[in-house]
């Protein structure tokens, strides 16, 4: 039996692609739709689980938000619209949920993504910062060659509460010679005060929704 001929498509014209404002040339980008989402629509997709991980805690579960295709797209669109004109060079995501939203927003802006991880999780040479917890301390690391001196860096995570890890990430980026252009979170818990601590460092904070009384 004779094999079927493959189907080919040819295009003889030229493609004239111009990236949206704030997006670097040559990057694959999402179409940014500013104003498409609202904080209330995003907030309604976040599930609240009481008494988790311990009694008295209201846990804000973003897995329901990420499971909704429109909701997830609204999150990425909202971040991209906010930062597309802020001359961001690279996005840094904090382990672990910063690894979910950070790369998607990086693609939307046409920039790279750098992970910040707990000690011992990165294979090459690292720099580190130790920071205080409620009981004890912890260490976060980043590859020494991940950020070039002078690069404008956007720090991303899912939620800002006490601000300890985000402040340590700022220290780590500045230690590497980067400039922290801002911090971005899906959720802010303003009563805990972490976002204000970051602002007190002179760093802008952007969030999509907030939950009071947590």
Kindly label every feature range from the protein language model.
Residues 1-17, 23-214:
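PRPP-associated nucleotide enzymes
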């Amino acid at each position: 039996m004779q094999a079927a001929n493959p189907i080919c498509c040819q295009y003889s014209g030229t493609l004239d692609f111009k990236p949206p404002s704030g997006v670097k040339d040559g990057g694959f980008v999402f179409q940014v739709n500013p104003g498409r989402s609202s904080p209330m629509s995003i907030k309604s997709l976040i599930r609240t689980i009481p008494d988790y991980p311990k009694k008295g805690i209201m846990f804000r579960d973003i897995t329901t938000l990420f499971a909704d295709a429109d909701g997830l797209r609204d999150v990425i669109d909202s971040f991209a619209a906010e930062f597309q004109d802020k001359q961001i060079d690279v996005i840094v995501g904090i382990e672990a949920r910063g690894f979910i939203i950070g790369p998607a927003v990086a693609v939307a802006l046409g920039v790279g993504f750098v992970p910040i991880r707990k000690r011992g999780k990165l294979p090459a040479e690292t720099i580190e910062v130790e920071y205080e917890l409620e009981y004890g301390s912890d260490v976060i690391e980043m590859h020494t060659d991940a950020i070039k001196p002078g690069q404008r860096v956007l720090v991303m995570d899912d939620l800002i509460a006490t601000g300890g890890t985000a402040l340590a990430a700022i220290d780590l980026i500045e230690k590497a010679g980067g400039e922290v252009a801002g911090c971005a979170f899906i959720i802010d818990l303003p009563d805990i005060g972490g976002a204000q601590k970051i602002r007190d460092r002179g760093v802008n904070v952007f969030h999509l929704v907030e939950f009071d009384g947590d």
